[in-house]
């Protein structure tokens, strides 16, 4: 566990430095060579499915890269990741969550015997999360006989009062549990085919699972069986599919 936590701290420090250098570089290029800046941002967007998402144009999101809002949100994400406690082979954190009906429960209450539990963390304002919702729903359809699924709604990735994107869901950052529940109900309208719960306003689940802005896990018998890389680039339902296929 010590080495895992040390790696977390080193990774966060490296990512923070990367964010600062990237932002400075992009802002210089936007002045000296706008076309090159655009190419670099589009390349980064391709890795997180922004360029593949027909809902968004470059102007909706690309111009925000390197902004103060970009730096602030990315830095906050790295800071929250320092509190993670979910590691492969270790006990799964039984963090508290709230159902969309307002009932308080916890993540491990959704574990059933030896059946795997797939956790999908995200929010409506996270375009890669919503873009891959169809892929996630297909996972549910294909493996409902093998595993259970749970969506955990966390703080907004791109709230209208934060690092906002054009043509995105118009949701402000949650100020209360009711705000978060209201946002989660918008996701429920998209029928994720599994239960949806929300993180507490302390963001305890997002912290313990390092799940901001999005992340995938597979739990089994109280342990972490699979831990996807941090989103948006690491949110890969195909990796979960590979894990579940081995359990048939």
From Swiss-Prot:
It is a single-pass membrane protein. Expressed in liver. Its EC number is 1.21.99.4. The active site is at 126. It catalyses: 3,3',5-triiodo-L-thyronine + iodide + A + H(+) = L-thyroxine + AH2. The chain crosses the membrane at residues 7-29. It comes from the Eukaryota. Gene3D superfamilies: Glutaredoxin. GO terms for cellular component: endoplasmic reticulum membrane. GO terms for biological process: hormone biosynthetic process; thyroid hormone metabolic process. InterPro entries: Iodothyronine_deiodinase, Iodothyronine_deiodinase_AS, Iodothyronine_deiodinase_I/III, Thioredoxin-like_sf. It is an enzyme of class 1 (oxidoreductase). One of its GO terms (molecular function) is thyroxine 5'-deiodinase activity. Its main location: endoplasmic reticulum. Pfam families: T4_deiodinase (PF00837). Belongs to the iodothyronine deiodinase family. Responsible for the deiodination of T4 (3,5,3',5'-tetraiodothyronine) into T3 (3,5,3'-triiodothyronine) and of T3 into T2 (3,3'-diiodothyronine). This is Type I iodothyronine deiodinase. It comes from Fundulus heteroclitus.
